[in-house]
């Protein structure tokens, strides 16, 4: 795929995150301590973005997703300038930002709202009494205040709620509140991740994160006793794999036509 054929970009502009979500790959074993492979210095500056993605390369881009696998958009102090650069280079480009929303000032969110063709998807997993059970280290009221400031200035905001056992009774209340606050869309989704214990800084279990009891995607529960066995279950079947990272003969490789990136003309940066 040539660059001129690319229409969608998925950008990860920060390796930093203010949240400590138990099921995030950033925090092994649902702890408070980051995976040693994470480099918190991997935060893009506006100069780096302009160098790597100059306006001439962005002019034909139609969609940009800013979503962190390990970090959150709001932890980048150049975030506003980066989004403005994308819009200036491609004014009709639709920009979607996924964030926990629990940082920056109301004024900062108002400034973000001034950028056209932008949607911010706030991760709000329940009401004030349940949200931070999963989105640890975030503040529900701060997120609501930031979303309110963003929406008040004309910003387009979505509310996405991940349904767990501890918040499944609040879906309708969250949907009602989202409507009252002016969110454009409310999305409720189940998780396909297994149950895990949330641990404090001393390694002690404070509570459990479990899928909703009516979830169609439940995979089972990881207990303290079988956690290590679950993590290494693939190693117990070496016959399924070949050396040198080669795929087993019995597992067909997808054709190029099945590649999502090629079909959607999208790349991850």
Q: What are these model-predicted stretches?
A:
Residues 9, 65, 158:
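Conserved Rossmann-like nucleotide-binding pocket used by diverse enzymes
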Residues 4, 12, 27-28, 32-47, ...:
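Radical SAM enzyme [4Fe-4S]-AdoMet core and its adjacent flexible, acidic
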Residues 16, 102, 164-165:
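Short, surface-exposed acidic/glycine-rich loop or hinge patches that mediate macromolecular interfaces
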Residues 1-6, 19:
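Recognition helices and adjacent regulatory flanks at domain boundaries
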Residues 17, 21-24, 259:
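Short cysteine clusters
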Residues 19, 26-30, 46-126:
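Conserved SAM/AdoMet-binding glycine-rich loop
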């Amino acid at each position: 795929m040539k660059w001129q054929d690319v229409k969608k970009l998925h950008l990860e502009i920060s390796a930093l995150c203010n949240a400590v979500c138990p099921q995030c790959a950033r925090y092994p074993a649902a702890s408070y301590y980051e995976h040693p492979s994470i480099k918190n210095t991997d935060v893009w500056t506006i100069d780096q973005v302009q160098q790597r993605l100059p306006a001439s390369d962005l002019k034909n881009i139609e969609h940009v997703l800013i979503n962190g696998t390990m970090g959150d958009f709001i932890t980048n102090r150049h975030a506003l300038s980066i989004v403005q650069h994308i819009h200036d280079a491609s004014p009709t480009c639709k920009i979607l930002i996924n964030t926990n929303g629990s940082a920056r000032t109301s004024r900062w969110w108002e400034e973000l709202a001034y950028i056209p063709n932008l949607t911010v998807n706030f991760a709000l997993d329940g009401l004030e009494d349940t949200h931070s059970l999963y989105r640890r280290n975030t503040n529900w009221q701060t997120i609501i205040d930031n979303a309110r400031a963003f929406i008040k200035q004309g910003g387009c905001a979505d509310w996405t709620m991940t349904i767990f056992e501890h918040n499944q009774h609040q879906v309708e209340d969250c949907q009602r509140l989202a409507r009252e606050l002016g969110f454009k869309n409310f999305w409720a989704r189940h998780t396909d991740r297994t149950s895990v214990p949330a641990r404090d800084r001393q390694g002690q279990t404070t509570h459990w994160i479990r899928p909703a009891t009516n979830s169609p995607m439940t995979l089972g529960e990881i207990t303290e006793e079988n956690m290590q066995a679950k993590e290494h279950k693939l190693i117990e079947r070496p016959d399924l794999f070949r050396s040198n990272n080669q795929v087993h003969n019995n597992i067909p490789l997808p054709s190029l036509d099945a590649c999502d990136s090629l079909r959607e003309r999208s790349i991850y940066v």
